[in-house]
Amino acid sequence: MSDAIRPQPGILDIALYEGGKSHVAGIQNALKLSSNENPFGPSPKAKEAFLRSVHTLHRYPSTDHAGLRQAIAEVHGLDPARVICGVGSDEIITFLCQAYAGPHTDVIFTEHGFLMYRISALAVGANPVEVPERERTTDVDAILAACTPHTRLVFLANPNNPTGTMIGQADLARLAEGLPPQAILVLDGAYAEYVPGYDAGLALVEKRTNVVMTRTFSKIYGLGGLRIGWGYGPKAIIDVLNRIRGPFNLSTTQLETAEAAVRDQDHVARCRADNARWRVWLAEALAEIGVPSDTSMANFILARFSDSEEAEACDLYLQSQGLIVRRVAGYKLPHCLRITIGDEASCRRVAHAIAQFKRMR
């Protein structure tokens, strides 16, 4: 690279994001449990909408996403004027950093938090501030202690990825109330639908002017391949984000498929119930063979091994058995493997394989 042609400060500090592995060399039809995907896929109604959309591929999509915003608002009891849609919730995170962070500002997140928080902060030249967790769970006091007059954004995934842990409404409220006046709390609810009765921060958004929530269609809705997310917040903040959002950032196919998906809450309920059943089963099965995990509220568990060597060896053994899980050394958890909750057959298969691995140790 020429010394005269340089990227903005911070960009060269970004490590390339590595997604969950999809294939194992030499093994056909490996079972992928590495990306927290819904094993049942999208709603049949969403699939029908996807197929119908091919008839209008020559037309530009809506610029205001009115149909999808209205559907989201009706399902969740929101004001559609305060909903913004993006290419996954990642794009909403990027918008927030572009609009409210920059050089000489701080963006806070927890030590085992989603890697895109750091990446998005560095991309705008902001200072990423990582705060410690307490036994792989968000520590509100640590976040508040890290705040300074330079703090602009605080990102919190609840439930968190890759730990699966979460904090309650009282702690969320205490965090929002304790932030400095110039800071925005961003509640990332990518896995919120897996938690019965959890509003993902909606009550806080409605009561306060410094809280934004984000959601995704990639997890329980089974639309990871289409990349659709949304955010909800104070009107003033959403107005700012829409000013930097590309007018055609979502295709007609994305919009119509997501609208059908969010309206089919029966499918969501079935997926949530099945996930809860087999998440408990898998966690208990692994605990019985000496592989503990924290109580997860998402669609995965974080299996803990004695050390990084055992975790790596188990991962390699699982791959040899046609099972793909996720190493999380990049999240500072080298002794752990994150395992997506699949259907019954998948859960039984991975539990059996890990038991075999432990017997060979």
Curated annotation (Swiss-Prot):
Reactions it catalyzes: L-histidinol phosphate + 2-oxoglutarate = 3-(imidazol-4-yl)-2-oxopropyl phosphate + L-glutamate
GO BP of this protein: L-histidine biosynthetic process
Enzyme class: transferase
Annotated SUPFAM superfamilies: PLP-dependent transferases
One Gene Ontology molecular-function label: pyridoxal phosphate binding
Domain of life: Bacteria
Subunit organization: Homodimer.
Protein name per UniProt: Histidinol-phosphate aminotransferase
Lineage summary: Bacteria, Pseudomonadati, Pseudomonadota, Alphaproteobacteria, Rhodobacterales
